[in-house]
Structure formats: structure tokens, C-alpha cells
Amino acid sequence: MTFTAVDTPPHCLDDVAVLMPAYNGQADVDLTLASFNESALVHVLIVDDGSTPPIVAPTLANLQIEVLRMPQNGGIERALQTGIDALAQRGFRYAARIDAGDRSVPQRLAKQRAYMEAHPQVAGLGMWTQVVTRAGGPLFMLTPPAEPAAIRRLRFFRSCLAHPSMMLRIDAVRAVGNYRAAYPSAEDLDLFVRLMERYDCANLPELGLYYELNEGGISATRRRRQVLSTLRLQLRYFNVANPYDWFGLAKNLLHLVTPYRALQRVKRSLLAPRASH
């Protein structure tokens, strides 16, 4: 099924589409899409990146789902780039990112769209994120700053924008060159940095996403590639006058030599909720 956006009154989501790349994992796709709970029809574009067997659109009330099949597996960067272009061709204004296995909170899309309608300079809007295990158990909460100035200042020091929680202004994404494969495994940070050169990015300071941390699915090769891409981005956009750029550079050099599981243990310890007395 192919869908096309139409003019949208404030209470509708007809100019918003959920953008989800998927490679295998039909059960995760089904779980994620079933989590959407909005007062209006939700449009979804699944970019099937060469899955075997192919991803099938589940039948869910209040969701209109299209599957766009890539001829072969080409990686998340290519899948997202293709998805953004496809949504633009269909007339959508906003792309709401999510990954298979993650879960949306009720009314996430409506809240994000309302904010972006009221703030036209904002090209990307994230939300706070609860990180959970594969079984759904809570690990820690990501509560990045809300204001664009703080996000711009801290962009290389901490994760200020949780990619699967983001709503993106499609014309702005395409204006800065769309997703690209120049920085493998750091395609999100690459896009956000380019967006922040011309627009603002912000966060709604409330829970919007349950993010599944699948530690077994992160290979040492992919993690090293991600850290190296992040370091290249830091050097490309380095601001010597911003102390947080220096802190971020040191932090990512540390990441390069520290085992992934050790970093996750530290993060859980620092970000886990404390018992009240």
C-alpha cells in the first residue's frame, strides 16, 4: 500500500510518518508498531533492508503501513536516506524515527508534531528515553537537555539526541544532504551536526521512548567503527573555544580503548535511579 499526505488540521497526523528501517526481526517490528497509541491515524513506512524472509506489514488498528523493499541489504544509512526521499515524494512533512524492538509512549507523535508546528526553526526534536533490557527491564534513563543552545554546546560530549526518539523535518533533512554513509555507524550524529549548522534541534523533557539495549547485538567491529566515525566528526567540526568539545574528544578516545561492557556498567551505575530515603 502506498499512501500520500494531505493538508493536516492541528489534531491530525496526516503529514507525519513513522520511519523504521528493518533487517529481519519480524517479531521486533510487530512489537514496535503495536506500541503506537495515538488519537489519529498513524502512517508508517518500513524500509525493509533486504530481509530474508521479507518483512510483512502487520495488521494493526489505527495504523496505515507501507513496506518499501530494498533490493539487497545496503546498511541503515542507505535505508534511511531512501526512506526520507520516499516520504518527501509522498508529501509528508515530518518523519518520526523508531527502530525495531523499541516502544513508543502514548501520544508521542502528537506531542512532537505540536511542538514542531509551534517552533518552525526546530528541524529535529527528541524526547527522554528509558533504556531497557531485551526482557523490558529498566536499565537507566536518558534525560538530555531540552534547549537548542545546550544541545549545540554539548553535542560531542554526551548523547543529546536519542535517534529513535526523533521527529525530523523532512525538507530540512534533505536541505542538508539527507542521511549519508560518510560516517559509518554514526549516521545520526552526522545528520544532527549538519542540521544544527542551519537549524535548531531540541528535546521535549518527558518520556517518549523505551529503547531496547541489545548488548549481544553490538559487535566489537561495529562499535569501533562507530567510535572512529564519531572522532572524525569531532575533528571535522571541532570548536577550540568550547571546553565540551575538548572533554568529548577525550571521552571518545577513552571509549576507543575501553571494553563496551565496562562502559555500560559505568553508565548503569551513573544513570540508574537512586532509592529515596
Positions of the model-derived regions?
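Conserved donor NDP-sugar-binding/catalytic core segment of glycosyltransferases
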Residues: 107-139
